[in-house]
Amino acid sequence: MPLQKNQVLTLTIERLSNDGSGVAHSPDGEAVFVPGTAPGDEADIRIVKDCGRYAFGILDTLRTPSPDRIPVDCAVAGPCGGCSLRHLDYAAELRAKQENVVDAFRRIGGLDVPVLDALPSPEVDRYRNKVQFPVGRDKNGAPCIGFYAGRTHRIVPCPDCKLQPGILNDIGNALCSFFGAHGIQPYDEASGKGLVRHIFLRRGAHSGQIMVCIVCTRAKLPRSAELVEQLTAQFPDIATVLVNVNPRNTNVILGTETHTLCGPGFIEDTLCGVPVRLGPLSFYQVNTLAAEQLYGIAAEYAQLQPDDLLLDLYCGMGTIGLSMVDRCRSLIGVEIVPEAIDSAKANAARMGESVAARSRFFCADAGKAASQLAAEGLHPDVIVLDPPRKGCDEATLSAVVAMSPRRVVYVSCNPSTAARDAKWLETQGYRTEKVQPVDLFPRTKHVEAVLLLTKLNVERHIEVDVSMDELNVTAAESKATYNEIRDYVWDHHQLKVSNLYIAQVKQKYGIIEREN
């Protein structure tokens, strides 16, 4: 029987979905997704939408709180939509993230692979090195920083975001006070009037340097010299102040024109010892300390040897590959964003002549570049993949297989697409050895993962005797199917074999390939 809008059910939350919502089931077995709940909560849930096979609800009354529920320490955690898990104990959050990675690999990848416990972030709060505050007005009409409420462009004032270092919140508030004191108006989307759209701040986790970028609808910022003088006197760690111009009616934060009011126009920092320069357009991991943990796992999985060639696809600013360059003979990086490739080359140069000489970076689509490199006969020993959320396309994965690396290290920001891609690679002679979830975004639904895939080698894997009698094959002309072989090996040896591996064994022993 369909659930009705505003119907109230008493349900127990069983787990968290991959978007951070609690999952319960109605008496008829229909899944109900409820944000702001914790596994173990017993609550009255009000249905807001029934989609047939599943429904969405909201928390009406919490009857019995979960042992994993904690007090929310931010007044706008719900409305702002940023910290979807702020009500959950951090240990429970890590368990939920690990379980979601396991679920993705089983449900989407069809893979029962070892998924390790999620690696916690060194900092649970105040961990972000970048913030983009939309500028609006508070209830008194004064300029304020905040965040957009979920699925809207309504700004929720937030003077102290718990995910940002306190100094970045302080700078945002100081700028808004200056704007209010001097009549500098926030931009209003509805009317198209006003000047200041966003305050974009970066802070080097190791250097402490701060970049201030004020996004405006036009280049001229009133009293800019006075603003710079006051701001740098109050916050001496500010290394540069910029104005970015974005006059368009768009959701995109930054425009294409940037003017430097003071400093070099960038800040400097390091990531796993790689020196980086960061401007407004730089793509950079927002949790430096956790990213260094992730890169350490990637290097451990790569197991590079001194004579190895490392190929870093989707290399960005080159930081993953450059963090491993001292362990291998040479590095090739590929990235489609020209500014990122320029940064990668500059980062390599700052690491010294030896690193620069052994590192090459190319601006190209990862799939096309990988296909060309494979066609040219390139055979890297290890390939690192760090694709966007959509994962890799089949052309890229096919090129990876053609280049035949002994190891593939896959860094993922979306376990679902990582599981899909791992499933495809397993059909082509690679085995997913293990998956390490890494929490780069505490208090939010997001989780990263590092996968290790190794190339199967018919000469190095154990031999398994398969009896035709055990497979119930009686006719002399019959052959065991691939599925029968896979099932037999799993039932008797708890080993997984791919179609390519079976074909390699058949070819080695002269077994003719037919319909099986």
Briefly describe each language-model feature range.
Residues M1-V72, V76, F361, G367-K368:
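Terminal RNA-binding accessory module
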Residues P2-Q7, N18, A219-T474, Y482-N483:
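Rossmann-like S-adenosyl-L-methionine
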Residues G22-P27, G146-A149, C213-V215, A344:
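Short, acidic/hydrophobic/Gly-rich beta-strand patch recurrent on exposed beta strands
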Residues D60-V72, G78-P186, H206, L221:
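Extended interfacial segments that mediate partner engagement and assembly in macromolecular machines
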Residues I199:
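Flexible loop/N-cap segments at domain edges
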Residues R202-G204:
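Structural signature of eukaryotic scaffold interfaces centered on beta-propeller domains
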Residues T481-H493, A503-Y509:
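DNA-recognition alpha helix
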Residues E513-N516:
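Short Lys/Arg-enriched helix C-cap and helix-to-coil transition segments
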